[in-house]
């Protein structure tokens, strides 16, 4: 009997050791794959035949902005073209890994020199010693101003274009309020307006939809939160129930074919980042959500930001509830600007630049042709 027990224990131990060995091997393989996929260098821009475009730019840079070193990428098929500074969303979530993952031949970089900046506290610009005092809206505004001046000097421009998505659209509004003289025009994607109300509208939509399809699990999760409470939206709601249901119902980051796993993989396999940048992306997203998101929640642009000295153009997905399409429509109608416009993307949710990239590029070209002169002959 004792021999049988010992035999069973030995075999159980062997199985456990085998499982541990396999897990360790898998982890090592994943680390090696990630390391290989993290050279910290962007691929060169190529034409339709796969040939490198002469004179094109595809680079990673770090400079001091404000009081810390911050990183950004610059991509352009022709550096003489007009310049766009792209402000990512999140806050704390640079989009270039996702943009490149769905990139088509008709890309912004064919007509513009585009700077994708990792804002302070995330990705290349993550620093472990950054706290709430280092992450104010004014810090971001001043950083954007300084980076704009760097781009103007480097590329010999009197002005550039400013573009922002989600949180970046909120930041963009604040930037053009303070420094309108630096920009030809502002373009907001998924334009933030009154985000606290937007979150309430999104909650109501998800609750109604869950009731319509009789989805008890979703109703139970939503029932844990009160959209009229003072602390709404709570951090756990934002990271859990809200994100899950928005993406499931096609009203979040994208209308179709989106998963958080695909987003994570886009970031992890992004060759423009080093391993430390990928760690900084994850940690920075949490840092910004805890310290920056609520600046946007507490502000109502209908009251604080309505008069501008630069043209304002809004790109919004019809199905976007992550940032309300209805509120963005109202906002465009009431603001004062030298020129303004709303472009509705009828197949998109929150990311029309990635969901309908060809039309998005066409509209941006049209705007630039209005304010900058013809860039290329019309197709």
Please provide the spans of the model-predicted regions:
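Short substrate-entry loop that stabilizes the transition state in hydrolases
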Residues: 81-82, 90-100, 105, 109, ...
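Alpha/beta-hydrolase
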Residues: 216-303, 310
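Conserved acidic catalytic loop of the alpha/beta-hydrolase fold
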Residues: 139-159
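Conserved alpha/beta-hydrolase
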Residues: 107-127
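Catalytic histidine-centered segment of alpha/beta-hydrolase-like enzymes
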Residues: 348-357, 361
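A catalytic-pocket lid/entrance helix-loop region that shapes and gates access to the active site
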Residues: 170-172, 181-229
């Amino acid at each position: 009997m004792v021999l049988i027990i010992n035999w069973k224990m030995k075999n159980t131990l062997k199985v456990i050791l085998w499982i541990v060995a396999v897990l360790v091997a898998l982890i090592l393989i994943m680390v090696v794959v990630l390391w290989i996929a993290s050279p910290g260098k962007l691929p060169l821009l190529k034409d339709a035949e796969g040939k490198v475009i002469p004179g094109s730019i595809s680079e990673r840079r770090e400079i001091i902005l404000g009081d810390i070193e911050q990183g950004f990428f610059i991509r352009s098929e022709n550096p003489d073209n007009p310049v766009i500074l792209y402000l990512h969303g999140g806050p704390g979530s640079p989009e270039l890994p996702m943009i490149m993952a769905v990139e088509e031949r008709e890309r912004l970089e064919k007509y513009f020199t585009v700077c994708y900046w990792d804002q302070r506290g995330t990705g290349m610009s993550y620093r472990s010693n950054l706290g709430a005092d280092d992450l104010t809206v004014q810090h971001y505004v001043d950083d954007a101003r300084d980076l704009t001046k760097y781009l103007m000097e480097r590329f010999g421009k009197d002005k550039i274009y400013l573009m922002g998505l989600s949180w970046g659209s909120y930041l963009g509004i604040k930037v053009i309020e303070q420094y309108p003289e630096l920009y030809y025009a502002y373009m907001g994607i998924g334009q933030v307006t009154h985000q606290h109300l937007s979150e309430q509208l999104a909650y109501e939509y998800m609750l109604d939809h869950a009731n319509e399809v009789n989805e008890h699990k979703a109703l139970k999760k939503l029932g844990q939160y009160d959209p009229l409470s003072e602390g709404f939206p709570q951090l756990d709601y934002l990271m859990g129930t809200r994100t899950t249901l928005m993406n499931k119902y096609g009203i979040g980051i994208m209308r179709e074919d989106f998963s958080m796993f695909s987003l994570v993989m886009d970031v992890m396999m992004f060759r423009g980042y080093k391993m430390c940048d990928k760690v900084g992306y994850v940690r920075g997203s949490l840092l910004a959500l805890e310290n920056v998101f609520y600046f946007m929640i507490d502000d109502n642009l209908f009251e604080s930001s309505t008069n501008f000295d630069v043209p304002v153009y809004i790109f919004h997905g019809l199905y976007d509830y992550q940032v309300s399409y209805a509120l963005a429509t109202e906002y465009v109608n009431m603001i004062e600007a030298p020129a303004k416009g709303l472009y509705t993307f009828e197949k998109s949710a929150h990311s029309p630049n990635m969901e309908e990239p060809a039309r998005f590029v066409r509209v941006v070209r049209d705007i630039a042709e209005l304010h900058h002169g013809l860039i290329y002959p019309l197709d």
